[in-house]
Amino acid sequence: FAPVNVDCSDHPKPACLQEQKPICGSDNKTYDNKCSFCNAVVDSNGTLTLSHFGKC
């Protein structure tokens, strides 16, 4: 059973689509989608991780 991961290698992006596929981060914040989550991961210098898919 591998830990759940999100590939953020193609981020950050200047703009994210308004796609609703919520992701819960380790900061207990719900991100709208992978793009906004990955941008936050980059901003956090990699300290932010995925808690689970779906709202927190």
Curated annotation (Swiss-Prot):
Where does the entry annotate site (Reactive bond 3)? Q18, E19
From the Swiss-Prot or TrEMBL record, give the protein name. Ovomucoid
Q: Which residues form the Kazal-like domain?
A: 6-56
Q: In which organism is this protein found?
A: Ortalis vetula (Plain chachalaca)
Source organism superkingdom: Eukaryota
Disulfide linkage: C8-C38, C16-C35, C24-C56
Q: Does the keyword Amino-acid biosynthesis apply?
A: no
* Domain remark from Swiss-Prot or TrEMBL: Avian ovomucoid consists of three homologous, tandem Kazal family inhibitory domains.
Query: Per UniProt, what is one Pfam family of this protein?
Result: Kazal_1
Location, primary (coarse class): secreted
Which controlled-vocabulary keywords does the entry list? Answer: Disulfide bond, Glycoprotein, Protease inhibitor, Repeat, Secreted, Serine protease inhibitor
- Where does this polypeptide localize? Secreted
The stretch of residues making up the signal peptide is none
According to the UniProt entry, its GO molecular function terms are: serine-type endopeptidase inhibitor activity
Name one cellular component (GO) term: extracellular region
Residues modified by glycosylation:
N45
